[in-house]
Every structure is written in structure tokens, then in C-alpha cells.
Amino acid sequence: LAPRHPQRGEAVAALAVSRGLGVARRSQGQVPGPGCDVHVADTTGEMASWYAMAGVTVIGGTFGTLGGHTPFEPAAQGSAIVHGPDVANFAEAFAALDRAGGAVAVPDARALAGALA
């Protein structure tokens, strides 16, 4: 899980822990292992590597009213994309990726869970 702003890593990790999940934080040098449910990638300059390792990327900011974040970076690294309905900031790019099969739009969290299962 990569927060848009790495300084939010501690808060993101705390939220995951509060939900009973095991967490490792990249910024703290923690390595995911047994019992780690969430790896918080709260560093800068490594997103291309994370996308290259990810078979699927869920684009944040598309499940609320933020307009979504760029799909170009994960697409360039060959990571399939799942996104929510609010893609206003990159509407043409998401539409092209959806048509080409490089991205899948889902309407809500329940459908997201189904798409990732």
C-alpha cells in the first residue's frame, strides 16, 4: 500500500493495525514476512519498482471525489489496473486503458473485492 504522500505512512500503518492487520513499513526498514498483511511503501523514488512487481494496481483516489491519480506509471510497468468510478483527472487515459483491457472499472468497494478475488 503506497500512500500518495509518504509522510502519511505512520497514520496508514496505524489504521491497518487498528483493523487487526499485520504491517511492515518500508521507511522503517521492515521487511514483509509471515504475519504481514500490509506492506506500507512510504518512501519516495521507488514507485516504478513497486508497479513492476505488482500484478495488479488499485488506483487510489478513484473511489471518492478526488478525481483519481495517474494510471500512466503502473501501465508503463505492465501492472494491470483496477479503478473506481471517479477518474475525472485522467478520464481519457482510463477510458483507453479500459477499452484495451489494461484496466477494469469497478463501482465500489464490494466490486473491488470481487475483482481482486
Regions of interest found by a model, annotated:
Residues L1-A117:
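Nucleotide-activated sugar donor-binding and catalytic core shared by glycosyltransferases
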